[in-house]
């Protein structure tokens, strides 16, 4: 009865407070809603617009129901986007995570299969021969030894299986595109978070702040949930309990703008070849630039404020092929 009351409130256009949404999402993750009820909830939230209370409450419910990940006693970050920008770009965040790890920064990348593009993080990792469903213990070992591990959302959030069929049928952005990046089971307090619309910047930053993030950056890059090589990137930076809003262009990273079309990706297999070329120092200039710019902001979360210098370091580590060694070492974890 309580579930029906909460759903009814949503259908009436009412906002749920954090406690109410946390309760509703507990029921969702436990599989207590029918597909029809769940589709109704997702559509109602989408058309009415999600609020900070709802996002933070839903994240808390999902994390509370997740399989645990070993405690990490050193600084680490995540780089992840909401997806749903329908740009079908190459796998920039995944490549940036490998580059940052090669530079010595600890990265726990949380990812899933694609919902609205051809190749999500898990899709391309599979194509590269990387085991995406490693045990939590082996993933922690990879993080300890290689500065990097990938956590597959479906392995830790078993309740997502109740949601996946409805998301596939709807084939559109839902609150789960918004929630996913904030639900890393390692519970990072430092994240580079890409969002598919500038309208999400403020609400996403406020949600991250409410969830206890120490230093995170939310970005929207002229239509992308990545730093833009083709124009302006809007930024909301959470640091020391405050949110600062500003914008960046490729010039701030030491580059000139490039056409977005140069970042078009393909299937997981095609994107895996592009990613491999990048890490071997054989990538296209535009691809190198995109990865370097995103890596530069990721490095900022570790206290490296000079993003132009950060981007140059990222370019150099790709050029010398050391990042490809990191990829090969990661393949050994089975």
From Swiss-Prot:
Give me the disulphide-bonded residues. Answer: none
Q: Is Cytoplasm found in the keyword set?
A: no
Q: Where does 5-phospho-alpha-D-ribose 1-diphosphate bind?
A: 81, 84-85, 89, 91-94, 109-117, 121
Identify the keywords attached in UniProt to this record, alphabetized. Answer: Amino-acid biosynthesis, Aromatic amino acid biosynthesis, Glycosyltransferase, Magnesium, Metal-binding, Transferase, Tryptophan biosynthesis
Enzyme class, UniProt record, top EC level: transferase
Instruction: Provide an example Pfam family for this protein.
Output: Glycos_transf_3
* UniProt-annotated binding residues for Mg(2+) 1: 93, 226
Q: Does the keyword Signal apply?
A: no
Q: Which HAMAP family match?
A: TrpD (MF_00211)
Q: How does it assemble?
A: Homodimer.
Q: What is this protein called?
A: Anthranilate phosphoribosyltransferase
